[in-house]
Amino acid sequence: LHSFPTRRSSDLARLLLDGKVVGEMKPYDEKTGIIYWDIPFRVGELRAEGCDKEGNALSGYSIRTSGRPYAICATADRTILSGDRVTAHITVEVVDEEGTVVKLGDNEITCTVEGPARLLGLEGSDNSDMSDYTDNRHRVYHGRLLAYIQTTGGEGQVKVKFASPLLKGTEVKFEVRQ
């Protein structure tokens, strides 16, 4: 059995696996501050729902079982950068063949930048990681990392590429304008 805890968002909560109830409605535990269920592990989408007294869902949070790491997915907060020393943030994720983030992934990602920009750093948010954040290689933490890209004053297209052994790589393109 595995324990699946949830924090309080309402007085009652239930647990669903692929839309079917696997954890009956439970009240908030004043002593621990946590509602939890012990259930056998099964692959799928696990959803905790905070409910009112009538059983209507008021809030919820889902996680999905992932497969093996397959590819790198990158999403930028913007694709047009105006001016010198403007910073863009790129969220980099290791995903399975279905596009689900592999939370257990700790792959090392290499970043290269082409064009009028430079890599400021890579950050995985792992407090125990003492590696150089300004290096162009970094391990993902819980399947994710954040890349900081800064313009260098020129105009044109910027390509930011992400690669890792055995994973399908990706790239993000920016347009730099003055």
Predicted regions and their residues:
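Short, small-residue-biased leader/transition segments that mark boundaries at the very start
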Residues: 2-9
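Beta-strand-rich extracellular modules
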Residues: 51-53, 163-167
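Short aromatic-acidic-glycine turn motif
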Residues: 25, 69-73, 111-128
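Beta-strand-rich structural segments
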Residues: 49, 86-103, 109, 159-162
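Exposed beta-strand face motif in extracellular beta-rich ectodomains
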Residues: 42-46, 88, 154-158
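Edge beta-strands of extracellular beta-sandwich domains
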Residues: 55-67, 168-177
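Long hydrophobic segments that form regular secondary structure
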Residues: 10-59, 76, 95-98
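Short, hydrophobic beta-strand segments
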Residues: 36-41, 134-153
